[in-house]
């Protein structure tokens, strides 16, 4: 709702290839003509409601609002920044938002840190990806679990393998299938 109120439902999505760029250069590129931007790094999964970070950012007069999850209070790669945050920086110098810029903004009083809620996982390796998948499949506390109430009239596309411990409920139609016992 906050996004709609502030931007009248017109939100621009920029996907930036950061190959050879620092995160500061990528965020600058994504800003285009905007005065502030919500940046969400693509290598993380987070269930924290983004409207909360927007609300906190709008209620403070700072250059940056960042979501944190680590016990070290490091930014999680989800932040809102204003253009003014970059004015004193050398545009050619490789700099990292979460390692360099946001910590400096916190020290100077120009940033607000928000404690993240819910699930957060940074995915930087194949092992981290698999760990995240396992967590989402087997953690009973995941609020986004699919239940019979999520969808109605859904069709499952082929091919589908139904393995051990899967329940096929009455009313299900299985056609043109091989059954291995």
Q: Predicted regions span which residues?
A:
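Conserved N-terminal catalytic core of the sugar/cofactor nucleotidyltransferase
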Residues: 1-52
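Long, charged amphipathic helices and adjacent flexible linkers at domain junctions
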Residues: 137-159
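Short, hydrophobic beta-strand segments that form beta-sheet elements in well-ordered domains
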Residues: 64-68, 155
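Conserved beta-strand segments of alpha/beta enzyme cores
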Residues: 12-14, 63, 110-112
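Catalytic-core segments of class I nucleotidyltransferases/pyrophosphorylases
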Residues: 36-38, 45-46, 50-58, 68-143
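Conserved small/polar residues in nucleotide/adenosyl-binding loops
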Residues: 180-181
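Left-handed beta-helix
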Residues: 152, 157-158, 163-164, 169-170, ...
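Short, high-confidence coil segments that cap the C-terminus of an alpha-helix
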Residues: 34, 61-62
């Amino acid at each position: 709702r906050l996004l709609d109120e502030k931007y009248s439902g017109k939100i621009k999505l920029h996907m930036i290839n950061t190959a050879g760029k620092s995160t500061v250069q990528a965020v600058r590129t994504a800003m285009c003509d905007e005065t502030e931007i919500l940046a969400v790094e693509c290598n993380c999964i987070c269930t924290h409601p983004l409207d909360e970070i927007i609300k906190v950012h709008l209620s403070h007069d700072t250059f940056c609002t960042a979501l944190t999850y680590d016990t070290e209070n490091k930014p999680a790669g989800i932040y809102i920044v204003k253009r003014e945050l970059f004015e004193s920086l050398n545009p050619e110098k490789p700099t990292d938002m979460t390692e360099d810029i946001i910590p400096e903004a916190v020290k100077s009083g120009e940033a607000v840190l928000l404690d993240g809620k819910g699930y957060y996982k940074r995915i930087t390796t194949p092992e981290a990806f698999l760990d995240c998948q396992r967590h989402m499949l087997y953690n009973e506390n995941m609020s986004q679990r699919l239940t019979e109430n999520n969808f109605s009239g859904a069709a499952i596309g082929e091919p589908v393998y139904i393995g051990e411990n899967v329940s096929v409920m009455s009313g299900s139609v299985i056609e043109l299938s091989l059954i291995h016992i």
